[in-house]
Amino acid sequence: RRQRQMCIRDRSKALAEAKTAFEKDEVPVGAVIVSNDKIIARAHNLTEMLNDVTAHAEMQAITSAANYLGGKYLNDCTLYVTLEPCQMCAGAMYWAQLSRLVFGATDPHRGYRKLNTTLHPKTKVSYGVLSNECKLLIDAFFIKKRKLKKT
């Protein structure tokens, strides 16, 4: 029961990060990395603010977690992210040897599974967590962008 409560907390924190990104006119993706039931990194997309195509929530969180742990491997960590990671982020997860990935909404256009990108063999994956909330936030962002483009 405690484990389930921790998972709900971590998923909710990732969604809160995505909402922060939305408020900053960033693609609303949020990420949280957990080690030993403790959140060690939180991040959201910063690609617009930093003018950096690699500043995805997952990349920011991986860097922050590695700095916190004092090493590049995250083999005892879980990454909670609101959207299926892209190929670039999946590659970073592979090299970090992430033990578990949990994502909310799937990304049929740019998600890592579309191009059959593989994660580290030890990485366990689950998805569909808060998927509705995650998808609604992404959809709202792009609807807003399209409306602004028309005016």
What is each of the regions a protein language model found here?
Residues I143-T151:
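Glycine-rich adenosyl-binding loop in Rossmann-like folds that engage adenosine-containing cofactors
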Residues S12, S35, A41-I143:
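Zn2+-dependent cytidine deaminase-like catalytic core
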Residues V29-D37:
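Short beta-strand scaffold segments in enzyme catalytic cores
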Residues Q3, V27-V29:
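Short loop/turn microsegments at loop-to-beta-strand junctions
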